[in-house]
Swiss-Prot record:
Metal-dependent phosphatase that shows phosphatase activity against several substrates, including fructose-1-phosphate and fructose-6-phosphate. Its preference for fructose-1-phosphate, a strong glycating agent that causes DNA damage rather than a canonical yeast metabolite, suggests a damage-control function in hexose phosphate metabolism. Has also been shown to have O-methyltransferase activity that methylates glutamate residues of target proteins to form gamma-glutamyl methyl ester residues. Possibly methylates PCNA, suggesting it is involved in the DNA damage response. Its EC number is 3.1.3.-, 2.1.1.-. It catalyses: beta-D-fructose 1-phosphate + H2O = D-fructose + phosphate; beta-D-fructose 6-phosphate = dihydroxyacetone + D-glyceraldehyde 3-phosphate; L-glutamyl-[protein] + S-adenosyl-L-methionine = [protein]-L-glutamate 5-O-methyl ester + S-adenosyl-L-homocysteine. It comes from Mus musculus (Mouse). Keywords: Acetylation, DNA damage, Hydrolase, Manganese, Metal-binding, Methyltransferase, Nickel, Phosphoprotein, S-adenosyl-L-methionine, Transferase. Pfam families: ARMT1-like_dom. Its cofactor is Mn(2+); Ni(2+). Signal peptide: none annotated. Subfamily III proteins have a conserved RTxK motif about 40-50 residues from the C-terminus; the threonine may be replaced by serine or cysteine. This is Damage-control phosphatase ARMT1. The modification N6-acetyllysine is found at K40. A motif (Subfamily III RTxK motif) lies at residues 399-402. It comes from the Eukaryota.
Length: 439
């Protein structure tokens, strides 16, 4: 097997990784500090003087973190007592072991980008955890909820579209296929709403995405939806398969999560799947990633919406969860810095859970980076090989491109894109639905 290429890293000056560590991450830390400042009176009302002291302590820890990052200090071990602390510190040791004699310690602008960026979010969590009684405060909650409220028009249009299709069982097979393709594309473009890319600024969806699909089609660089349809429609017709399980590894809350829930509802209603398992994060992560609280909050707010299409969908989704047809899982592995190819060793229980799926949909850029090991693969390198042996079940990456990493393109395709749009890899303007089928 050929040697794997180098990791993406901020040591490549001018690269997207470099600009993220230099500009976007300090901006996110500043926003987190501002959020804590703004909630000072709320902390006082809830916890008295203790709340004020906790806010000061958290801000002090976060300011120290920002300074370490901006001055390229060595990465230090975590000191909290969480379930994953020892795994993080072991991984830091592993990063240290990869360095050559003159390299010094793992540092922000030198070590793999995936490691240091994940580490920053884990340190934010540590700062809050070390500041009781505000230790369960989600510093990103506000911006996630804002994204949902600002996207109401698009959410209403999408829910109305879904309800018009019901009962889905009454549709002809070609109609089901057509809608399946449509809702996969909506889930793809919903991935544009990423608050970590915008430094935590508003990134809501205000246009009716259904009307834009035709115009957006040329921006899908790899479209394996036919293969997904072939897999699920075949399973549906296989009498020996009474259970068809689809897992969705979630990315962003807000509008993107709604697009995932609408897709899941359609899969269930059309009997392309009999159960859906959602996987989210166990701690606040990368600004807008879904936690269990976000998942339940969205379903609850959909259900209590004064817009009929939204409340109908919300009630429906709550019923699916109550019946056990939909299940939400989280696992500490999703917020570790490890590439997914080591999941069987690091989190064998999670890998075994994913092996129960007939199809896994991995949403978003961070999942793609972890699937690919965040390495500088050639653009034409095969997707299956870049997965480095990770294959719990047939899987598909659904992401808009927000980092300098993409495999499986046709020869000449990347060069053509670079000539017409030099920033095609990082703006979220282009997307992929990239499938790795049954072995």
């Amino acid at each position: 097997m050929a040697e794997s290429p180098a990791f993406l890293s901020a040591k490549d000056e001018g690269s997207f990784a470099y600009l993220t560590i230099k500009d976007r991450t300090p901006q996110i830390l500043t926003k987190v500090i501002d959020t804590l400042h703004r909630h000072k009176s709320e902390f006082f009302e809830k916890h008295g003087e203790e709340g004020i002291e906790a806010e000061k302590k958290a801000i002090s820890l976060l300011s120290k973190l920002r300074n370490e990052l901006q001055t390229d200090k060595p990465i230090t071990p975590l000191v909290d007592k969480c379930v994953d602390t020892h795994i993080w510190n072991q991984y830091l040791e592993y990063q240290r072991s990869l360095l050559n004699e003159g390299d010094g310690e793992p540092r922000w602008f030198f070590s793999p980008w995936l490691f240091v960026e994940c580490y920053m979010y884990r340190r934010i969590h540590e700062a809050i955890m070390q500041s009781p009684p505000i230790h369960d405060f989600d510093v990103f909650k506000e911006s996630k909820e804002e994204n949902f409220f600002e996207s109401q028009g698009s959410i209403d249009a999408l829910c109305s579209h879904l309800l018009q299709l019901k009962p889905v069982k009454g549709l002809r097979e070609e109609q089901i296929q057509d809608e399946f393709f449509k809702l996969l594309q909506i889930s793809l473009w919903g991935n544009k709403c990423d608050l970590s890319l915008s430094g935590g600024e508003s990134s809501s969806q205000k246009a009716n995405i259904i009307n834009c699909l035709q115009d957006l089609k040329p921006f899908i660089l790899i479209n394996d939806t036919e293969s997904l349809w072939a897999l699920l429609s075949k399973l549906k017709k296989t009498v020996e398969t009474p259970v068809v399980r689809v897992d969705i590894v979630l990315d962003n809350s807000g509008f993107e999560l709604i697009t995932d829930l609408v897709l899941a509802d359609f899969l269930f209603s059309s009997e392309l799947a009999t159960e859906i398992h959602f996987h989210g994060k166990s701690i606040p992560w990368f600004v807008s990633d879904v936690t269990e609280h976000d998942f339940n909050w969205i379903v609850e707010h959909m259900k209590s919406s004064n817009l009929e299409s939204m409340s109908t969908c919300g009630a429906c989704w709550e019923a699916y969860a109550r019946m056990g047809r939909w299940a939400y899982h989280d696992h500490a592995f999703w917020t570790l810095p490890h590439p997914y190819c080591v999941m069987p060793q690091v989190a064998p229980d999670l890998y075994a859970e994913l092996q129960k799926a007939h199809l896994i949909l991995f949403k978003g850029d961070l999942n793609y980076r972890k699937l690919m090991g965040d390495r500088k693969w050639k653009f034409t390198f095969p997707f299956h090989q870049a997965l480095s042996g990770f294959h719990p079940a047939p899987l598909c990456s659904i992401r808009t491109l927000k980092c300098e990493l993409q495999v499986g393109l046709q020869p000449g395709q990347a060069e053509q894109l670079t000539a017409s749009d030099p920033h095609w890899l990082t703006t979220g303007r282009y997307g992929i639905l990239q499938f790795d089928g049954p072995l």
